[in-house]
Amino acid sequence: MATALVLGYSAFDLGLFSDKDPRLKLIKKAIRKDLEAMAADGVSWLVFTGSLGFEYWVLEVAQEMKTEYGFQLATIFAFETHGENWNEGNQMKLSRFKQVDFVKYAYPRYEHKGQLRDYQQFLLENTTSSYLFYDEENETKLAYFYQKMKNQEDYFIKRLTFDQLNELAENFSEN
């Protein structure tokens, strides 16, 4: 059973503040293409942390593909309090993360930074790969976790990059 941890830029990181942003269509097209390849490579479980942006868009696409590709979806939140202060629209998105095949919380609430380190280590040890929208030239808080992934032995990282999106956009506009 191959499992992929899904992580990537937040909508804020990308400057995408509307679900109707035309760039989302292109991002979701790239996600669909990547998920098809991952399914062909034997990935059956997609593991989310409940973050808005890339993770949520992958969740949306994976739910559309679930029946055809047999994906199982899991959300492992760091804390039970995750998203409790989000606005109503984001609460709706959070509820989709909670309506998957498997949901767990690592901790009741944040108490110290060691929890996040242990949570990240748990995610790495319990997945065989990751699907990551991250570009080293556009660093965010994912930089540390990305380094840990690269240092994890026998851990495959499938990346979506801005270059890939630009190439897809060029091909998309030519058709």
UniProtKB/Swiss-Prot annotation:
InterPro entries: YspA. Pfam families: YpsA. It comes from the Bacteria. HAMAP family: UPF0398. NCBIfam families: PRK13660.1 (NF010181). Belongs to the UPF0398 family. PANTHER family: UPF0398 PROTEIN SPR0331 (PTHR38440:SF1), UPF0398 PROTEIN YPSA (PTHR38440). This is UPF0398 protein SPD_0338. It comes from Streptococcus pneumoniae serotype 2 (strain D39 / NCTC 7466).
